[in-house]
Amino acid sequence: MKNLYDNVLQFKGKWRDYQDRVLQNSQKYLADGKLHIVAAPGSGKTTLGIELLRRLGEPCLILSPSITIRQQWLERITEGFLLPGREPEELLSNDLRHMKCITAITYQALYSAMKHYQGQLSDGDDESEEDERESEADDFRDFDIFDAVKAAGIKAICLDEAHHLRSEWWKALETFMKELKGMTVIALTATPPYDSTPGQWKRYI
């Protein structure tokens, strides 16, 4: 099968040892369609996640805890992978209603789409001051996220720090994932929920 990202994306740096080990064994790790990566902040999880998605070579959806982190994903793809002569707009989107080969959204946007919400979406950090949060207006009143995902041909999903979600966002994510069949899932975290209940741990993995 043709890889959508051939001649479009290529990592411009040098892999760290742990990244190289993961990549060399990625087919084995992804045998069940799921890969969980735990690594410290600043260790290059985002870059590794992008490379894994690039190697899968199919349309994908990246979910992040906040607008700020969502944009960091898109910036990292543009700066660290996008080949000369290619424009980010050809490949990247942050809008569920206009998905591209790589679409990055927030968990709040997913929740809002599933609830057909219209209004202002603010950044996901509850600890930040209200006037410091980034926000966006959205209207999902006539939007069917499952039809949109199917139309976009999404085959892979990357979950960034999914276990830190507020409960209603997590429930929306669970419902969303249960409805999708045959998806490859890559999950990234710096802080896995080791102190969680057995039920919470099962939900995480």
Features from the language model and the residues they span:
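Post-DEXD/H (motif II) to motif III coupling segment of the RecA-like Helicase ATP-binding lobe
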Residues: 164-205
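Conserved pre-motif I regulatory segment
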Residues: 1-38
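Conserved helix-turn-beta segment of the N-terminal RecA-like "Helicase ATP-binding" lobe
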Residues: 67-97, 202-205
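Inter-Walker segment of RecA-like/P-loop motor cores
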Residues: 81-141
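Walker B catalytic acidic pair
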Residues: 160-161
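Walker A/P-loop
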Residues: 31-52
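Conserved Walker A/P-loop ATP-binding site and its immediately adjacent core
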Residues: 46-81, 106-109, 169, 192-196
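Loop/turn-to-beta-strand initiation segments
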Residues: 59, 99-102, 153-156, 181-186
